[in-house]
């Protein structure tokens, strides 16, 4: 069994040898070489020719090159059988620092199958410079190192091999070190610094050298590293005193711890070698050690016991100074102390009879304390003088020999200085003099000499009406510079009567916190401005106080619905009956719904709309959006119902809006069925026709006056602009918006005069803005919380102009008047405010939707007349509205200029003019004259002056 296994093993071995021989016969091995970084297409070898293959059989036999790791680096051209470089070859990437580097390829051909092995050696080129691992090497070398001391350095490395990696080193020139190269067994070299000159840290604490490494390639590359050599200190310098002998002269009887001398030694070393300790030498006797002591750290020699001239007049002290080096080094000096005879008794100061604290209102000359001084010496050494700390409101007055009084020299103010630390110095007449001091603490007691002060004299607060009782309006705060009870501030109202009621029925002030509360709901229609004073009183005796003016503006809310006014045809709020001829054309005014709203601003701006009729009904009427005038939209025909019931909805512009409904009954009649109506119409036509010309003349006159005013303003502006510019002449004027509705268009103006600027000229104050007399106070918007306060507080509130107030009856007639807020907007532009005045729109047919940008409704009082800041288009009358009334300020007259030409589709609207009383009277006289002349020319005997 064993022999059979042995025979089988021999047979296997012989078979393996035969297969290996056959493989070597069928396979071959080639060797090529190529330099790294060779370009693409670089020739490596004629591999087909070297393998004995014909070029024509490369493709049929499927000639191919295979490599396990680097198959894409080399490629064979099947057309010519040349092996060439296909991609970049980096020897350092392939083989690292290995000396031998090759690429192994397997060339395979079929028919029959043959495998050839090809080794391509990659030769190195010098493409890498020497590199150091760091840019700077630090070496710490003690200055005590001996000559020829060696300090190894970290060498450079080169990624190349062979001659390209052989490095040589070079050191920058210096006088302390030379460079030595050590060869390693692996042929690497590393540099070593060799000390050739002793180092001295005191002369050169550090050295900077440059080590350069150069490789052996062609061309050669270099790399460098900076060497920072830090010289460490060695204790090679002994401490040295400034002088070997010190001489000191001092008087006898010096107190303990009196400084005799401060010795100063220096050591050129550093660190612990520079730290020194002072001590008495072993040669100093014990008697001197008892009388003097030395501070081992600072070198100060001080008196430790009584020194008396009569015992010894000189002392010789030997002092050593030792550093903390290893080994320590010592320096020496001698101190000669010479004592001088002197006045050896100091004065004594005694302070008695203190009257503290001192009230700040104490009279000048008040005695604060008594001071006595004494000195046990005699003669000049026993004569004592006293002095006080300078720059204090006290002085010393001598009352008797060695007795003084501390008295008040000037007025005290506790708020400026609450306490004084006085130092009384007593000095005798010795040479040198001795002195003693005593401290006196004087506390200043407070008196009530400061009244509580508010941050500003007045504030403006805005509160919405209908507030709940106990609503927090504002918080006042005053500050008192005094202390304790004198600084406790309490607040109260300055009581006064508002009509028949007292102020305390409206508001209250919390005595401690200063919070102001509204005791009842405020009503804007009843009380627009609540102005009162809050008093702040301190707790002093007698108490001092000051007042603060608080202006509370009650902001309007939409809490009043529109109210219908009575008309000649019916009672207020009831149905109105009107007769209309079927022959009237489009645009004929049938009736006018009049309403008034007790609110202000947008809450009183009324609009009218016709309620929709039943489905399929034809209503030939419409209502003016802001005039309330019901007019025909077309010519009436037989198909129209003889009785029309119109529902007109009147609503304001508040949030939410409130409404009222008016009912108008219109009866359509034939001409023969309404003789009374016809007669009334014939009677009214004449004055209306006569009034047309009056309106034309009046409009022409107004335009002429306005043009003259504009020309005057332009001329005045040009003259002012031609003058020398003054700083701040045309600066931006900060507008203060102090009242705003929810839609943001109604505002109160803080300033009664507005500046008109042009270019760089002087400011203009000629243009008057009619506004309520609001004080230029800080604007505070109260919505349940206190708000920030700012603005100019230097002006006082002014009373509003009575010329711009209207009676209740006049307000009712202004249901469709154009307010100055809507017609004139003062806009702050780049060149200054730009004012637009109300104008009459052209008489063009109005659109179906009604008037656009309407005037405000009735019920708005004169306090709403103001200019408006900010951009935005001014609200103007609609294109189909012609003003039918002029309201002349200062006069209760309402001049009617209504005209109703036949077949006219023009709706009417009102606007208000403004001006002085004298100009108003002249215009009224002129209107009356024109009307009289028109009456005479046309023969009309009646004039409708109902609106006047």
Swiss-Prot record:
InterPro entries: Cadherin-like_dom (IPR002126), Cadherin-like_sf (IPR015919), Cadherin_CBD (IPR031904), Cadherin_CS (IPR020894), Cadherin_N (IPR013164), Protocadherin/Cadherin-CA (IPR050174)
Compositionally biased residues, Basic and acidic residues: 907-921
Membrane topology (Cytoplasmic): 717-948
Region called Disordered, residue ranges: 783-804, 827-948
Membrane topology: Single-pass type I membrane protein
Source superkingdom: Eukaryota
Ranges: PXXP repeats: 732-735, 772-775, 797-800, 830-833, 871-874, 889-892
Protein name: Protocadherin alpha-10
């Amino acid at each position: 069994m064993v022999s059979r296994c042995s025979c089988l093993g021999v047979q296997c071995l012989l078979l393996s040898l035969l297969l290996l021989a056959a493989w070597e016969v069928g396979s071959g091995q080639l060797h090529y070489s190529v330099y790294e970084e060779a370009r693409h297409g670089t020739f490596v070898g004629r591999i087909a020719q070297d393998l004995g293959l014909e070029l024509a059989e490369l493709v049929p036999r499927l000639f191919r090159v295979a490599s396990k790791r680097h198959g894409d680096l080399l490629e064979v051209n099947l057309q010519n059988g040349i092996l060439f470089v296909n991609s970049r070859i980096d020897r350092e990437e392939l083989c690292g620092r290995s000396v031998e580097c090759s690429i192994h390829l397997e060339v395979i051909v079929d028919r029959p199958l043959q495998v050839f092995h090809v080794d391509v050696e990659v030769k190195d080129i010098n493409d890498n410079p020497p590199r150091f691992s760091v840019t700077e090497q630090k070496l710490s070398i003690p200055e005590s190192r001996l000559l020829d001391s060696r300090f190894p350095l970290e060498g450079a490395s080169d990624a190349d091999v062979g001659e390209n990696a052989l490095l040589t080193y070079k050191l920058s020139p210096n006088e302390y070190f030379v460079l030595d190269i050590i060869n390693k067994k692996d042929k690497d070299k590393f540099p070593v610094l060799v000390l050739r000159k002793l180092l001295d840290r005191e002369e050169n604490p550090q050295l900077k050298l440059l080590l350069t490494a150069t490789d052996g390639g062609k061309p050669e590359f270099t790399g460098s590293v900076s060497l920072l050599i830090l010289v460490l200190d060695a204790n090679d310098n002994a401490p040295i005193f400034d002088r070997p002998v010190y001489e000191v002269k001092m008087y006898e009887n010096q107190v303990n711890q009196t400084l005799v001398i401060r010795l100063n030694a220096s050591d050129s070393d550093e660190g612990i070698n520079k730290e020194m300790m002072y001590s008495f030498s072993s040669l100093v006797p014990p008697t001197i050690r008892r009388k003097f002591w030395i501070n081992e750290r600072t070198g100060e020699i001080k008196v430790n016991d009584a020194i008396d001239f009569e015992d010894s007049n000189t002392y010789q002290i030997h002092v050593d100074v030792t550093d903390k080096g290893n080994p320590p080094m010592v320096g020496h000096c001698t101190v000669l102390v010479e004592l001088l005879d002197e006045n050896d008794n100091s004065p004594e100061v005694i302070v008695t009879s203190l009257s503290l604290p001192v009230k700040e209102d104490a009279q000048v000359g008040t005695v604060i304390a008594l001071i006595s001084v004494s000195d046990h010496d005699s003669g000049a050494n026993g004569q004592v003088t006293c002095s006080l700390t300078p720059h204090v409101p006290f002085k010393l007055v001598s009352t008797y020999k060695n007795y003084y009084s501390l008295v008040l020299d000037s007025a005290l103010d506790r708020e400026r200085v609450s306490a004084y630390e006085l130092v009384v110095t007593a000095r005798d007449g010795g040479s040198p003099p001795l002195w003693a001091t005593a401290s006196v603490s004087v506390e200043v007691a407070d008196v009530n000499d400061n009244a509580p002060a508010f941050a500003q004299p007045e504030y403006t607060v805005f509160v919405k009406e209908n507030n709940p009782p106990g609503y927090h309006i504002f918080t006042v705060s005053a500050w008192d510079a005094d202390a304790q009870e004198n600084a406790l501030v309490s607040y109260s109202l300055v009581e006064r009567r508002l009509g028949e009621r007292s102020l305390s029925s409206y508001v209250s002030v919390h005595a401690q916190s200063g919070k102001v509360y509204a005791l009842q709901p405020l009503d804007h229609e009843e009380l627009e401005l609540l102005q009162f004073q809050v008093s702040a009183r301190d707790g002093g005796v007698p108490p001092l106080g000051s007042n603060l003016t608080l202006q509370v503006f009650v902001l309007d809310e939409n809490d009043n619905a529109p109210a219908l006014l009575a008309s000649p045809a019916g009672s207020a709020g009831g149905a109105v009956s009107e007769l209309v001829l079927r022959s009237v054309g489009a645009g004929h005014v049938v009736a006018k719904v009049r309403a008034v709203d007790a609110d202000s601003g947008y809450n009183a701006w009324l609009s009218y709309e016709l309620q929709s009729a039943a489905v399929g009904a034809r209503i030939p009427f419409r209502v003016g959006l802001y005039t309330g005038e019901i007019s025909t939209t077309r010519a009436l025909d037989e198909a129209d119902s003889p009785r029309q019931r119109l529902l007109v909805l009147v609503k304001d512009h508040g949030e939410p809006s409130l409404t009222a409904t008016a009912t108008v009954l219109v009866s359509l009649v034939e001409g023969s069925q309404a003789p009374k109506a016809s007669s009334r119409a014939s009677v009214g036509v004449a004055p209306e026709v006569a009034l047309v010309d009056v309106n034309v003349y009046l409009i022409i006159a107004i335009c002429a006056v306005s043009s003259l005013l504009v020309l005057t303003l332009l001329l005045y502006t040009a003259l002012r602009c031609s003058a020398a510019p003054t700083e701040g002449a045309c600066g931006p004027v900060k507008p203060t918006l102090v009242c705003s509705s929810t839609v943001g268009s109604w505002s109160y103006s803080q300033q009664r005069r507005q500046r008109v600027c042009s270019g760089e000229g002087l400011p203009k104050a000629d243009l008057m803005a009619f506004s309520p007399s609001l004080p230029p106070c800080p604007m505070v918007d109260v919505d349940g919380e206190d708000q920030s306060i700012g603005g100019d507080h230097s002006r006082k509130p002014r009373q509003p102009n009575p010329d711009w107030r209207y009676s209740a009856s006049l307000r009712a007639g202004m249901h469709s008047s154009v307010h100055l807020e809507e017609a004139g907007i003062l806009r702050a532009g780049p060149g200054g405010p730009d004012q637009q005045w109300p104008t009459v729109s052209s008489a063009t047919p109005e659109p179906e939707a009604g008037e656009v940008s309407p005037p405000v409704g009735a019920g708005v009082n004169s306090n709403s007349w103001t200019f408006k800041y900010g951009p935005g288009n001014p609200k103007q009358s609609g294109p189909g509205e012609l003003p039918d009334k002029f309201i002349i300020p200062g006069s209760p007259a309402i001049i009617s200029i209504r005209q109703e030409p036949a077949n006219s589709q023009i709706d009417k609207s009102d606007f208000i003019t403004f001006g002085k009383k004298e100009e108003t009277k002249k215009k009224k006289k002129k209107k009356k004259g024109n009307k009289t002349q028109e009456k005479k020319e046309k023969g009309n005997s009646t004039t409708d002056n109902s609106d006047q």
